């Protein structure tokens, strides 16, 4: 089974480098992949889907040339071929309308303002990937235990089987 992927998208190479560095503690369990535009990210996702590579999380900047992060994440939701993939939006320049669209149209799971703190990013990502892992790998989640968020796991155990709002 290929490792699930965390796809990071930002048009600024230094921001991508910081994201990859901050997410490095997860690299034993997840492949961290980057793209510098929504167009590149779309091609990466198409390739992963064709190869059967699971995509756990998309971390996208909002303000990018061409297609914004909200527009891209809306396209991902509308595609329908990544139903379990979690979505995290990063931005320092979102308007109130952007935030509403991110929630209502793109079904973004979380939002983090730039600049972020590494521990904040890892906490949010940990919560999102825990929900993903418990949903997609219910019988083999133990292999991910070192990086799963314990609070989310306890909440899930208390809720019992069935659909959950852990996003």
Task: Label every PLM stretch briefly.
Residues 64-65:
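Receiver (REC) domain active-site loop signature in two-component systems and cognate sites
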Residues 115-125, 129:
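C-terminal output helix
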């Amino acid at each position: 089974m290929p490792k699930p992927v965390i796809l990071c998208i930002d048009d600024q190479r230094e921001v991508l480098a910081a994201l990859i560095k901050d997410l490095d503690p997860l690299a034993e369990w997840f492949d961290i992949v980057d793209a510098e535009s929504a167009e590149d990210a779309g091609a990466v996702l198409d390739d992963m889907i064709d190869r059967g590579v699971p995509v756990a999380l998309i971390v996208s900047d909002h303000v990018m040339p061409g297609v914004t992060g909200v527009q891209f994440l809306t396209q991902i939701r509308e595609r329908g071929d990544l139903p379990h993939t979690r979505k995290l939006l990063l931005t320092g320049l979102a308007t109130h309308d952007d935030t509403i669209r991110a929630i209502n149209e793109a079904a973004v799971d979380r939002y983090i303002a730039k600049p972020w703190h590494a521990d904040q990013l890892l906490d949010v990502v940990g919560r999102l990937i825990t929900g993903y892992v418990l949903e997609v790998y219910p019988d083999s989640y133990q292999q991910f235990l070192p990086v799963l968020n314990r609070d989310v796991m306890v909440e899930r155990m208390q809720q019992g089987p069935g659909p959950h709002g852990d996003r």
